[in-house]
Amino acid sequence: MARPTKKTGPKKQKKNIPTGVAHIQSTFNNTIVTIADTKGDVISWASAGSSGFKGAKKGTPFAAQTAADNAARRAIEQGMRQLEVMVSGPGAGRETAIRALQGAGLEITLIRDVTPIPHNGCRPPKRRRV
């Protein structure tokens, strides 16, 4: 019979990272907030789906606010105080997520829109007929 392995303490140790970058990817269906340090190593992340929303509710501004709040709380536990924010996508939760990061106690130094815009690249999908 296999012996149970012993668990050795918490796997994630607390770091002291004062500045970082928050990437907010906001689509029509979901909002994903990822907070990384200046090197690019991810410190915390949250999405509307991981925050407990399902289906069409994931695309709402309130779901984006909850996701940003969860990610910010975990980043503050790691010692984060200042953020640069990179916003990507056309979703409804863009501004709400930025406001939630500010409301959680993080100081935002820069907001940049990094939504990829094609210079007439790939053909878009056909229009929906409802």
Swiss-Prot record:
Gene3D superfamilies linked to this entry: Ribosomal protein S11
Cell membrane as UniProt keyword: no
InterPro entries, per database record: Ribosomal_uS11, Ribosomal_uS11_bac-type, Ribosomal_uS11_CS, Ribosomal_uS11_sf
Entry GO MF terms: rRNA binding; structural constituent of ribosome
One Gene Ontology cellular component: ribonucleoprotein complex
Pfam families assigned to the protein according to its UniProt record, in alphabetical order: Ribosomal_S11
Alphabetized UniProt keyword annotations: Ribonucleoprotein, Ribosomal protein, RNA-binding, rRNA-binding
GO terms of biological process kind: translation
Functional note: Located on the platform of the 30S subunit, it bridges several disparate RNA helices of the 16S rRNA. Forms part of the Shine-Dalgarno cleft in the 70S ribosome.
Quaternary context: Part of the 30S ribosomal subunit. Interacts with proteins S7 and S18. Binds to IF-3.
Similarity comment: Belongs to the universal ribosomal protein uS11 family.
HAMAP family, alphabetized: Ribosomal_uS11 (MF_01310)
Protein name from the UniProt record: Small ribosomal subunit protein uS11
Organism of provenance: Microcystis aeruginosa (strain NIES-843 / IAM M-2473)
